[in-house]
């Protein structure tokens, strides 16, 4: 784990080592496997681009049942701030009619994006929708929607790494870093 990373004009310091992320993915995959293994259901695993690419890939490797992988691209952030609006940048890559869908998200904070996506999926006639997120900011989450699978909870800080970015950079780090408010470039 690097001591500090610089992305654009911001400096980030270590928050969660990759080994801890891997263990949390093992745990959340075990919960999903317990719910689906032997059920005969082939759910859609819906990767929310771009942030959940790494999480989805790691999660899929640990699942012990068949899944149908699809993706969608939504955005609600500009720089380090939420815009308050959810935009669909790329539509669903398949048909969810009559299917059970597990949304795979990188991070849930206020819940606006996940709430909008659940509405989209039910409007597209999904039979059932579950939510799996790598990270949850519980102090920010204010929606009645249940989150079925949560790998880790974190404080309300701006983070990068393991799929999460700051203006396009930082997704490729295997560790998660937090904005260093004391040391800015």
Sequence positions of predicted segments:
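PRPP-associated nucleotide enzymes
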Residues: 1-185
């Amino acid at each position: 784990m690097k001591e500090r990373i610089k992305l654009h004009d911001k400096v980030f310091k270590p928050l969660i080592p990759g080994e801890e992320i891997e263990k949390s993915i093992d745990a959340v995959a075990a919960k999903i496997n317990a719910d689906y293994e032997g059920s005969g259901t082939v759910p859609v695993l819906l990767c929310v681009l771009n942030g959940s690419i790494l999480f989805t890939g790691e999660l899929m490797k640990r699942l012990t049942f068949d899944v149908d992988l699809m993706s969608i691209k939504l955005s609600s952030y500009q720089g380090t701030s939420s815009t308050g609006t959810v935009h669909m940048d790329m539509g669903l890559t398949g048909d969810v009619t009559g299917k059970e869908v597990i949304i795979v998200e990188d991070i849930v904070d206020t819940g606006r994006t996940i709430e909008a996506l659940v509405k989209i999926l039910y409007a597209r006639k999904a039979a059932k929708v579950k939510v799996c997120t790598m990270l949850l900011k519980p102090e920010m989450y204010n929606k009645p929607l249940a989150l079925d699978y949560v790998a880790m909870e974190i404080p309300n800080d701006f983070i990068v790494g393991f799929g999460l970015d700051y203006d396009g950079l930082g997704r490729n780090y295997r560790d998660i870093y937090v904005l260093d408010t004391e040391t800015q470039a």
